[in-house]
């Protein structure tokens, strides 16, 4: 590494830690804002934990946001913008993206360490239901336009690829689309998995829109 690079990296991390607020409150009562608060508080908790510092305030703030998100989870598995509202594919996709980001960065471990292994069980169950909701929405009404609150194929595949552990019901998808359209879908999946030069998987991310 170039001379001074290590010191520079340490300084940046120190700056991040010093800039941490006590906790982050959601900017609004909507699920998108709550998911952001959950994410930021657990990110802060992760930074604190790496230094051996207390994280309970951050974890409690994150779980407060989780509780409000769960209140907006519907029987069909999707999340509405607010509690009592109809499920939205866009809102649900954002929740799934952010949860996957926390999982990938191993920030969910902070919650388990602080509150116990079962602390996120309810949210884990809601996430699995949300993935199945995304499947049902996309294959239940594939002609529903994006502007009507649905998501594009690329956005669906981006989110779905984060949850390969949730079984995909190929038979149901084939039945919903028909043989011809399902074959087209498979071609699109292949094109997504093997992007052309200059393209990236993240091009379909909901949060990048």
Task: List the predicted regions and their residue ranges.
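Short strand->helix junction
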Residues: 199-200
């Amino acid at each position: 590494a170039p001379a001074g690079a290590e010191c520079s990296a340490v300084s940046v991390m120190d700056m991040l830690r010093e800039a941490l607020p006590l906790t982050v409150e959601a900017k609004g009562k909507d699920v998108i804002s709550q998911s952001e608060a959950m994410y930021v508080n657990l990110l802060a908790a992760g930074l604190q934990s790496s230094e051996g510092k207390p994280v309970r305030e951050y974890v409690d703030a994150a779980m407060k946001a989780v509780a409000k998100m769960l209140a907006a989870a519907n029987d069909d598995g999707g999340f509405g913008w607010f509690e009592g509202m109809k499920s939205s594919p866009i809102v649900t996709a954002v929740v799934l993206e952010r949860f996957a980001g926390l999982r990938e960065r191993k920030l969910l471990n902070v919650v388990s360490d602080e509150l116990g292994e079962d602390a996120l069980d309810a949210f884990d169950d809601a996430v699995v239901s949300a993935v199945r909701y995304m499947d049902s929405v996309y294959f239940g009404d594939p002609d529903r336009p994006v502007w009507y609150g649905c998501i594009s194929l690329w956005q669906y595949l981006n989110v779905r690829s984060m949850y390969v552990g949730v079984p995909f019901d190929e038979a149901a998808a084939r039945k919903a689309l028909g043989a011809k359209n399902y074959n087209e879908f498979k071609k699109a999946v292949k094109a997504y998995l093997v992007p052309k030069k200059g393209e990236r998987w993240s091009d379909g991310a909901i949060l990048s829109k």
